Structures are given as structure tokens and as C-alpha cells.
Amino acid sequence: MAEITAKLVKELREKSGAGVMDAKKALVETDGDIEKAIELLREKGMAKAAKKADRVAAEGLTGVYVNGNVAAVIEVNAETDFVAKNAQFVELVNTTAKVIAEGKPANNEEALALIMPSGETLEAAYVSATATIGEKISFRRFALIEKTDAQHFGAYQHNGGRIGVISVVEGGDEALAKQLSMHIAAMKPTVLSYKELDEQFVKDELAQLNHVIDQDNESRAMVNKPALPHLKYGSKAQLTDDVIAQAEADIKAELAAEGKPEKIWDKIIPGKMDRFMLDNTKVDQAYTLLAQVYIMDDSKTVEAYLESVNASVVEFARFEVGEGIEKAANDFEAEVAATMAAALNN
């Protein structure tokens, strides 16, 4: 039986990332053969990873990496926020973003086949990470955006990396692109323009907005406040030329009824029409970047601000950790009991 020295254990830990006891046990089982010990740890690690495969991993980090005219934003998940702050996990996320930006895969299948700096595939790296870190670690998704030499990337991460954004701006500079990415991180647009919203989606969202108004009106009635009117429209897509013409005619009739001189109408009507547009594009404002009030200049929408500086947004991608993942609502006492039972059975 070979002597299992502290030096040998340390060497195995450095090569495999295993804990002290796991490394020592592997060396004992392989009679001190470090290469066989590494293989044994890998096999055990894959078995552990397989046991964790059905767990829900809804925490984690985004990663953002710019490689010349290509940028990648990715999402990597872990089971707990604690592990998401682990240095090994953070390094894995950053390395993955770099490999994705450089490899330019077409889909997740191609991404998982990319070779990491360690020489293993991305998929194998995540199996190893799951075994080493002790939680299910999963590569969830990525987006690649390409630009021309004349365009600029805005790369931004927020809330400790839980949100990652890439934007492309034409006609501006990198500082403008970065500011837009900060806006996107905060305001959560899902598409660029109202033209990308589905007609039925707009109708459903408008109905939901009016439902909220109904609830508000119930509260207002209790304190004798006047009821708020329902919204007739929710998107610029619904504001046809006839609708806009009628709105302007209604404003003129209102001004006439108030006795306002016609010679000053031209100064009043534009502001009231702007108000009409804001009041009747609430769905656009919630979901489309160009319709949102710009957080860097709240006197303008993003679209109006970009026009004022002769710039435009070409594309953007925003990832937030856990979007669309249904987290398991575990009972804490039951979880502790299950953990203790598992420990007793081992």
C-alpha cells in the first residue's frame, strides 16, 4: 500500500478541484496512483452530477463578453445564490461567455460542444462543476450579436451580474450604447418597436390595464374621488390616422368650449397630442424600448432622444437570471427533515 502523503493529496486537489476527504479516499482506493485517482473522482463526480440533474437551478449569473465585432450574453444557473457568488462559478461563467463569443455557435447543442481552455467540452465542464461545487450547475442560454465597424456595443451587467445586457448603437458612441444598456437593464423592454408586438398580445395587455383601473376606481369610490376612464388604446399600432385625426378634433372642440382663442391653439395642441400619445401607448411603454421614457432624460422617449442625437438602436439582448424558470416552493422543515434522513441512510 502506497503512503498517502499530504503533498500527494494537495496535488490531486489542485488537479481535480476535489475536497480533502474525497481526494484522500480516491488515492487510497487507487493505491496512490494520481491519474487513476483523477479518473475515479471524475466517474464519481459524473454520478453525483446525474443525481442532481433533476433539481431546479434558478439562481446564477449572466455573463457578457465582447470579442471585436461579436458580443455574447449568457445565463448560467445554480441552485442557490450562495453558490452563484463562488469564485469557481464566477470564473466558469466568464470563461463560458468568452468561449461563446469566440466560437459563435448557432444553438445550445453547438455551444455545449465547444472546447473550453481546460481541453474539455463546455458540457463536460458543467458536469465537472456540478460534481465539484456540489450543486446542479447548468448552462441555460446565450445570445450573440454582431455589429459593423461603424457601430458600437454597449455591454452592461446589473445587480451583481443577475442582469446582463448587450446593445448596438449606430450614429452614437460607446458611452451612449452603455447608457442605453443601463436603461434596458432597468426598464425591461422585450422588443425594440411596437411593430414587433402581436395584435392579440396588445389587446390582452390593454384588458389587464383596464382591470387595474377598475380596481383603482373601487378604492377611489370609497373616498368619493372621480372614477378614472378606461384606456381605449394601448399601442401605436392601434392609433390609425383616423384615430389621431379624431383626437386632434376633440382637443380643438375642448379648447373652443373653454373659450381659448384660436390664435394660441397651435401652442397648446402639440402638448395635448403628446399627452394623448403617452396615455394611449401604455403597452408599448411597458414592452418596447423606443416608446419608453428615457431614464437619462425623462423629458423624452428613447426614440425621441436618439433622434435628437442622430443615433439609432440596431439591436439589443437582455437576460435576467431565472426568467421563466418555475422555482420549487419547498417547505423548510420538510427540507431539513429530508436532509437529515438522507444523512442517516448514507
Curated annotation (Swiss-Prot):
An MF annotation (GO) of this entry: translation elongation factor activity
Protein origin, superkingdom: Bacteria
InterPro entries referenced in this protein's UniProt entry, alphabetically: EF-Ts_dimer_sf (IPR036402), Transl_elong_EFTs/EF1B (IPR001816), Transl_elong_EFTs/EF1B_dimer (IPR014039), Transl_elong_Ts_CS (IPR018101), UBA-like_sf (IPR009060)
CDD domains for this protein: UBA_EF-Ts (cd14275)
GO biological processes: translational elongation
Record flagged with keyword DNA-binding: no
Keywords for this protein: Cytoplasm, Elongation factor, Protein biosynthesis
Residue ranges, annotated region (Involved in Mg(2+) ion dislocation from EF-Tu): 80-83
Stored PROSITE patterns: EF_TS_1, EF_TS_2
One GO location term (cellular component): cytoplasm
Main location: cytoplasm
Pfam families: EF_TS (PF00889)
Keyword Protein biosynthesis: yes
Family designation: Belongs to the EF-Ts family.
Role summary: Associates with the EF-Tu.GDP complex and induces the exchange of GDP to GTP. It remains bound to the aminoacyl-tRNA.EF-Tu.GTP complex up to the GTP hydrolysis stage on the ribosome.
Protein name: Elongation factor Ts
The organism's taxonomic lineage, starting at the top: Bacteria, Bacillati, Bacillota, Bacilli, Lactobacillales
